[in-house]
Amino acid sequence: MAVVALVPAAGRGVRLGEKLPKAFVELGGCTMLARAVDGLRKSGAIDRVVVIVPPELVESVVADLGRASDVDVVGGGAERTDSVRAGLSAAGDADFVLVHDAARALTPPALIARVVDALRAGSSAVIPVLPVTDTIKSVDVLGAVTGTPLRSELRAVQTPQGFSTDVLRSAYDAGDVAATDDAALVERLGVSVQTIPGDALAFKITTPLDLVLARALLISETELSADSQDGK
């Protein structure tokens, strides 16, 4: 059963404070996008990766990623939902699709493989999650607290999110695609979304502090690897 990973990469990165689209911000010697794609390929669970970027950036992204037989770069639309639609069209007859944020550039390949394993085991929709450690409040438009959800019932959602291709296509064909993640669209169809344990390294690099943390983690990883080599 074929698995295709879709990587929408058109976000402008306003909150990150960078001039470049955030997928093209440097992280440890290469772009965040290149790291995200590399993690997908290293998982051993993905047959093909489809990267969706603004049409005018297709050639430069191909140059950044290198020409690989298992990576396609296609033009997307103005909104993320338009880009995912373009990715679904490029996915062809894949049995499963994963949708992955380029900004989650440090996602461990093992987490990606676990999402695919859950799909192959029979789930139609799978998302990695982490327990919420902060207390969460709901507020009104004036900032007044309106409620406190039970923390034990809340989870922070990560990517890649995995789906049966037919299910995700049906969700996008249903019309209303206003949602903060693809799983929410699938939920509206009445499809059960299965959760699996996420990974702290799959955090989304959204703010300048996130970028500092990601770069520090990579430096630490490089130093540990060098120490290990010296100890041989």
UniProtKB/Swiss-Prot annotation:
EC number: 2.7.7.60
Site (Transition state stabilizer): 15, 22
This protein's UniProt keywords: Isoprene biosynthesis, Nucleotidyltransferase, Transferase
PROSITE patterns: ISPD
Annotated site residues (Positions MEP for the nucleophilic attack) in this chain: 151, 204
Coiled coil: none
Pathway in which this enzyme or protein is active: Isoprenoid biosynthesis; isopentenyl diphosphate biosynthesis via DXP pathway; isopentenyl diphosphate from 1-deoxy-D-xylulose 5-phosphate: step 2/6
GO biological process, one term: isopentenyl diphosphate biosynthetic process, methylerythritol 4-phosphate pathway
Catalytic activity: 2-C-methyl-D-erythritol 4-phosphate + CTP + H(+) = 4-CDP-2-C-methyl-D-erythritol + diphosphate
UniProt GO molecular function: 2-C-methyl-D-erythritol 4-phosphate cytidylyltransferase activity
Family, per entry: Belongs to the IspD/TarI cytidylyltransferase family. IspD subfamily.
Job of this protein: Catalyzes the formation of 4-diphosphocytidyl-2-C-methyl-D-erythritol from CTP and 2-C-methyl-D-erythritol 4-phosphate (MEP).
Protein name per the record: 2-C-methyl-D-erythritol 4-phosphate cytidylyltransferase
